[in-house]
Every structure is written in structure tokens, then in C-alpha cells.
Amino acid sequence: MSSVKRTPKQEIVTQFHCSAAEGDIAKLTGILSHSPSLLNETSENGWTALMYAARNGHPEIVQFLLEKGCDRSIVNKSRQTALDIAVFWGYKHIANLLATAKGGKKPWFLTNEVEECENYFSKTLLDRKSEKRNNSDWLLAKESHPATVFILFSNLNPLVTLGGNKESFQQPEVRLCQLNYTDIKDYLAQPEKITLIFLGVELEIKDKLFNYAGEVPREEEDGLVAWFALGIDPIAAEEFKQRHENCYFLHPPMPALLQLKEKEAGVVAQARSVLAWYSRYKFCPTCGNATKIEEGGYKRVCLKEDCPSLNGVHNTSYPRVDPVVIMQVIHPDGTKCLLGRQKRFPPGMFTCLAGFIEPGETIEDAVRREVEEESGVKVGHVQYVACQPWPMPSSLMIGCLALAVSTEIKVDKNEIEDAHWFTREQVLDVLTKGKQQAFFVPPSRAIAHQLIKHWIRINPNL
């Protein structure tokens, strides 16, 4: 700081800047309370109080000035912002405070590219062929086609049989029981007792269609193998199991559904979500009257002639999807992540924080709100990574990275049981050694696991 005689204004600016440079929060607060216009004042070299705090490594001063609304975009005579200064001098925590405040720049350690990935439950064997849902004649013909595949459900649990392989997560692999018309024709004869959903057609044309050339009229053969989900009641399900001892209904949903082959899991995710909607909305949500099923199981139509739901398009008439944000919260210095646990979790399991998006809320704001509600940690920059259908019963998990701008954890016991910052080394040990460690994370087929791995992969030298 120069010792040249200054004007009264220059003197107070100098004192303000000195208090920021020295980390004197009490003095800084006092000066600013009397002279709030000093917040963005610059010295002769173009430096602001924020720059001095960033240069000397005072995160509490930086946080205070940011909360007061100081301008982070000001550049000094060397064309540096406060963020540039913090990065140059190696103050990672401060650099991220400056970069991750809402509306700020992307944190310096995040990559610009996020590779698109397919998570478990998102792969499928089928083309949904939604244009066929209104073609009742086509659907009826496919129901009795000998090549058509039916997958059976009871209480939302799919009928499966054990497969012969094991995968890396050490769970026995199970496969869907793919039934044909002969297996289930008695159920189709009692439509009032079943739920039938058209799922789509196989993506690959199979030679087996040619085996039925004599059984199907030539004009009805289009080369498409249709799949349907068939929901039956528990009594019928028990009778079916007794006749097919090598099959069983997969239960409980978690973690049992994670044992399916990946493409079959995508089919189950679709079927289970629609069947869950069907079981929960048997009556019109608008007027309470009975409904009928149309569009291959994808629409409920009210039977009351003057019901408002019959005028226009209403989301109450179609299967619902519940958007959920799930986020890997990263410490401001980039070297730790925030994981939490709920009481219902297995002992020792920690995972990413998550929560439902509220009406009128963006993905980014939902991330910030949920993290603060559950852990007390404030979040700035949010970056989308990937999503995953989650049929429990019909959620869409929207996976994000979330950069914390505060570090103190204040757990809301009504939301979660516990939360901690975990170092990169701790998380790496868990991913490589599993449950041998003091804690563990969800299995690889859950998006939480993939978000954690994604964080580990970015800037591995941090």
C-alpha cells in the first residue's frame, strides 16, 4: 500500500482494502456498514477488496463480500479478476467460492465435456411403437400371434427364472420368463381381472416369425414381434407358479431388480411404471368416476360424459413420471464429496443426496434447495451429468454434480440421518475394496454409484 498522502476517501478505501487483505472481518464489517458504497471501490492498481482477500487466502472475507453482492467480474490493471488471482496463487477453496456462486462461472476443475451414458434401466430390447397404440385391430391381432411375448407381473413383481451367469456385482443373474399366447390365453379371456399393457416391438427382426408362416394370415404378418406386460392378481399368480416351478416373482424390488440382464431391466422399468400408475389411478382424478383403458394401456379415459378431463389433453389421463434430482456434492476445493444416509438404509451405506423437483422449479434450483434442506450446505454451480429411469414406482433420476460454496454440515434429522465429507482417497478405497471399508456406496447399477465414479474420474490429480 502506498504511503503518499491521500484524500479522506482514498484513506477510507485503503483501510477497507487493508482489512480485506489482513482478514480482519470485524473491521471490514464496520467500515462497510458505514460506507456500503466501498464494496466495489478500486485502488490505483484497479484492485478491489475481493481481490485482496483472494490474494491473501481469506475465504471468510470472500464469502462475506459475495453475500454483500460485490462484483466478481471487475478486472484490475493487469486484466485479472478475483478468480484469476485466487487460481494463480493456488487458493482452490477461494477459487471455487468465486466460481460456483449461483450464476457464476463453471468451477475450474470441472471438465467441459460430459459423455452421454446409458444407465441401468435405460437400455431396452424394444421400440415402443407408440403409433400402434391407437390401432386396436393391430393390438388384438398381436395378442394372439404365436410369436408375441408376454411378461407376467403380480403386485408389480415380474416373473423370472434363474440365469446361468454371474456378473461383477456378485448377484445371481435372473432372466424374464418370456411367455407366449398359449401360456396366458386363459387370462386374456377375463379382461376384467387383468391389466394388459403394450410395451412395443423387438428392435431386431427374428427368424422365428417364419416358423409361424402357416398359422398367421399373410396380410396380418408385418415382421414385428410384439411384447405385452400382463398384470394378474396374487391368487392367479400363485396358481401359475405351481404349474411352473422353475419360475418365481422377483421380490422385493430392491435390490432384486438389479439382478436382471440390462436390456430386460429396461423393459421391466417401462412395464412396472405403467402398471404402478394403473393400480394407483383406477378412478378419474378429476371427478372420481370409473375409467376405461385405451391406447394400449397408456391412457385412462373417464366414463362420465361431462367430465372436464374429456376436453383437451390432461396429464391425469396418462402415466406419470416423477422427476427427482440426485447430486454428487463436491467440496469447494474439489477434493471431497458429500454423502448422506437415511435411517432405512443398510448399516454403513452412504449415497448421493436426492429429492423430488417441486412445481415451478428448475433442476438447478431443486439441487440447491434439496442439498441445503438435508445437509445445510449451500450449492452454487450445478452441472447435469446423466439420468436414469427408476421404477419405484415411476421416478426419473436426474444426476448432477453440485459445487458447494459452504462446508459446514447441519443435518435435518427429518430428512436424513447423517452426512459427511469423504475424501477422494476414502471413496476410491470403497469403490475398489467394497464393504471391507468403514462405509459403502450403492451398487454399480444405481446412478448414485455412477455419479460418484464420474467425480473420481474428473481431474484425478486433484
Swiss-Prot record:
Substrate binds at residues 318, 354-356, 370, 374, 415. It is found in: Cytoplasm; Peroxisome; Cytoplasmic granule. Mg(2+) 2 binds at residue 370. It catalyses: a 5'-end NAD(+)-phospho-ribonucleoside in mRNA + H2O = a 5'-end phospho-adenosine-phospho-ribonucleoside in mRNA + beta-nicotinamide D-ribonucleotide + 2 H(+); NAD(+) + H2O = beta-nicotinamide D-ribonucleotide + AMP + 2 H(+); NADH + H2O = reduced beta-nicotinamide D-ribonucleotide + AMP + 2 H(+); NADPH + H2O = reduced beta-nicotinamide D-ribonucleotide + adenosine 2',5'-bisphosphate + 2 H(+). Zn(2+) binds at residues 284, 287, 302, 307. The keyword Cytoplasm applies. Disulfide bonds: none annotated. It comes from the Eukaryota. ANK repeats lie at residues 11-40, 45-74, 78-98. This is NAD-capped RNA hydrolase NUDT12. Mg(2+) 3 binds at residues 370, 374, 415. GO terms for cellular component: cytosol; peroxisome. The gene is NUDT12. Residues 319-453 form the Nudix hydrolase domain. Binds 3 Mg(2+) ions per subunit. Keywords: ANK repeat, Cytoplasm, Hydrolase, Magnesium, Metal-binding, NAD, NADP, Peroxisome, Repeat, Zinc. SMART domains: ANK (SM00248). A motif (Nudix box) lies at residues 355-376. Its EC number is 3.6.1.-, 3.6.1.22. It comes from Pongo abelii. One of its GO terms (molecular function) is zinc ion binding.
